[in-house]
Amino acid sequence: MIKNLKKSKKEVYTHFQNAAQNRQSLFAILFDPEGFDVTSIEIQLKRIPKNTTHILVGGSTATQSQTQVAVRYIKEQCKLPVVLFPGDYRHITAQADALLFLSLLSGDNAEYLIHQQIKSVDILRDTDIEIIPTGYILIDGGIETAVQRVSNTRPLSQNNIDLIVNTALAGQYSGKKLIYLEAGSGAVNRVSVQIIEAVKKAITIPLIVGGGIRTQQQLQDAYRAGADMVVVGNAFEKGDF
């Protein structure tokens, strides 16, 4: 595992690149700011695994104020880089170290492909937050997720690996700096190792995988298949990590 380092602004993507080039595994804990509770978050921050390299903050239905409060508190209590994983442009706060500037590539909803990004410009142009263009691809995790409901899109079938690979490559060709394969919060089925292997073989940019990973074995399987970063949320909240 890569050594934990505090990353200042403009350094987060370099960290991703270096880790991918050196085959070092990144690990992120995802905090959903909805229903933010200081006591609960304080307890969770104290038990963050030693191999954690980043904190992601975001959710599909959180408010801007919830996100701001969560980011501010986590930054005060934790030295790891805090990266926004927004479900809406209103979740953006300049207090974070970086922003995954998500484009939902797996659906046909223009709101989450480009319109949300346009709406965010007035917020972002006056900040120095590191912006990382990210191709976000929903993979069927066996249940309907909050992202599906909010975006009104359907995930790609795990059986259609060619389509998933082509979608990831389309993201890379259009200038994305990361590809994020997402099975969804609480997914029954995680992104298969076959998908991870195929996408990693095809792209030349770092690969993030999240959703449905509940055990250390599943975590290591994702790394071996080619994930540069694995994101865990629900399993950490439940004490499995």
Please describe what each predicted stretch is.
Residues M1-F31, I41-E42, I123-P133, D140:
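N-terminal amphipathic alpha-helix/helix-capping segment at the start of soluble metabolic enzymes
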Residues A20-Q21, Q68-C78, Q172, I196-T204:
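Surface-exposed amphipathic alpha-helices with a cationic face
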Residues S25-I41, F85-D88, L138-I164, V209-R214:
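Active-site mouth loops of central-metabolism enzymes
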Residues L26-F31, T53-V57, V82-L84, L99-F101, ...:
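Hydrophobic faces of well-ordered beta-strands that scaffold small-molecule active sites
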Residues I43-Q44, L84, D88-L102, A198-V230:
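Catalytic cores of alpha/beta
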Residues H91-Q172:
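Conserved anion-binding
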Residues R149-I196, E237-G239:
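Glycine/Thr-rich beta-alpha phosphate-binding loop at enzyme active sites
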